[in-house]
Regions:
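Short coil-to-helix segment of the ABC ATPase nucleotide-binding domain corresponding to the Q-loop/switch region
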Residues: 102-111
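Catalytic Walker B motif of ABC-type/P-loop ATPase nucleotide-binding domains
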Residues: 168-171
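Helix-to-loop junction immediately C-terminal to a conserved catalytic motif
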Residues: 56
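Conserved ABC ATPase signature
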Residues: 143-147, 151-153
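Conserved catalytic motifs of ABC-family nucleotide-binding domains
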Residues: 164
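Conserved ABC ATPase "signature" region
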Residues: 72, 120-138
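Conserved ABC transporter NBD signature motif
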Residues: 64-72
Length: 253
């Protein structure tokens, strides 16, 4: 039986632009299966990031429902939403938000202590995750301004996953990285997905989108394309790229 971790019903989001209401998301229905790596694509202004923020509870919809594991979240108070996010969601953004006055290890632990109590086990887990994502012990006492962009983004990912979130949201996580650093970060997302993590990611980049097993294409605030693939690594990479490119071409990408 299919298990949906996230659903929307008639989701709408509007903004006032010079006194004129702009409909960014329009009556959008969506079901996200638990364990899927869902990629959201579309042209600039199509509503990608707006949808991501509504799905994650970081922004409330104007109308409609957002349902997380059977529970509606759109009418929760800001405090209730903050509590919900801490226990269920991890976030990785294009702009890397690390606390400049804290070391790498302390940045990760600060994120963890929002949910968990400090303990030797927690510190051990933080160090293990940093190692797994390529941040060696020699960097644990460095400060953010001593890291490369790729290193800082990897620290951000560790901070996002240390609390074992049910779902991980990412908004253009490789957008400010060079190609090599971007590939390293994508390898981490692929490994996380192989371990059963649900991921919803916004991107405009083909080499990022190819890592997912589902690609949604947005236009004018609605889903106009829904393409599914095997999990990354389970099919021929060249054929995978060609088929996804063909789908995106049909969408006008």
């Amino acid at each position: 039986m299919v298990s949906f971790i996230l659903q929307t019903e008639k989701l709408c989001k509007t903004f006032s632009n010079g006194g004129v209401m702009q409909h960014v998301i329009k009556n959008l229905d969506l079901e996200v299966e638990e364990g899927d790596f869902t990629v959201i694509m579309g042209s600039s202004g199509s509503g990608k990031s707006t949808l991501l923020y509504a799905l994650s509870g970081m922004d409330k919809p104007s109308m409609g429902k957002v349902i997380f594991d059977g529970t509606e979240i759109q009418n929760k108070s800001n405090d209730e939403l903050a509590t919900f996010r801490r226990g269920n969601c991890g976030f990785v953004f294009q702009s890397i938000y690390l606390l400049e006055n804290q070391t790498v290890l302390d940045n990760v632990l600060t994120g963890a202590l929002i949910v968990q109590k400090n303990s030797p086990e927690l510190v051990k887990k933080a160090k293990e995750l940093l190692e797994k994502t390529g941040i060696k012990e020699t960097s644990w006492n460095k400060y953010p301004n001593q890291l490369s962009g790729g290193e800082a983004q990897r620290v951000g990912i560790v901070r996002a996953i240390i609390n074992n979130p049910r779902i991980l949201f990412a908004d253009e996580p490789t957008g400010q990285l060079n190609s090599a650093a971007g590939n390293d970060v994508l390898d981490i997302f692929t490994e996380i997905h192989k371990n059963g993590q649900s991921i919803v990611m916004v991107t405009h980049d083909l080499k990022t989108a190819i890592r997912g097993n589902r690609v949604l294409y947005l236009r004018d605030g609605g889903i106009v394309g829904d393409y599914r693939m095997p999990r990354f690594g389970e099919d021929d990479i060249k054929e995978r790229k060609n088929k996804l490119t063909e789908f995106l071409g049909d969408m006008g990408w």
